[in-house]
Amino acid sequence: MKYYLAPLEGITTYIYRRAYHQHFAPMDKYFTPFLVPHTKKGFSTKEKNDVMPEYSPGMNLVPQIMSNQAESFLHTVEKLKVYGYEEVNLNLGCPSKTVVSKGRGSGFLADPDGLDRFLDEIFKKCDVKISIKTRIGKDDPEEFARLLDIYNQYPVEELIIHPRVQKDFYKNQP
């Protein structure tokens, strides 16, 4: 079994990850809080601190990207490659209403055709491994069969499944 430290916005910053890694049983993989791509500017200081390898020594750190625009996703991957990253994680699990209202995170699951086009483009053009964190649907668990058919078309490094739909947030039974 592998153990991963999932990102919690505002909590699992590089300071938390480093302290955890030094004082507790190390995780097999650590994920950064999600980065929202900005095509016209670089990383903020906070984002840079979270992805700088020297702030996470000895950790298998994977930057998480939240986007519904292939060009922005790919641009962010190029910026991360400068730091030596060979894997990124696509966040399709965040249930926040502000995220979902923009069609990002688990909001992107409501548009399976758009998601398929997005994945097609990023997998054709990206030369790093891509893992995906997903929920089982936006509104109904029955959506997962279609989503799984889409994911199975691509060389996904790893599929991390949060067994709830977006509208459940973090409540109800998984």
Where are the language model's segments positioned?
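Flavin-dependent oxidoreductase catalytic cores
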Residues: 1-174
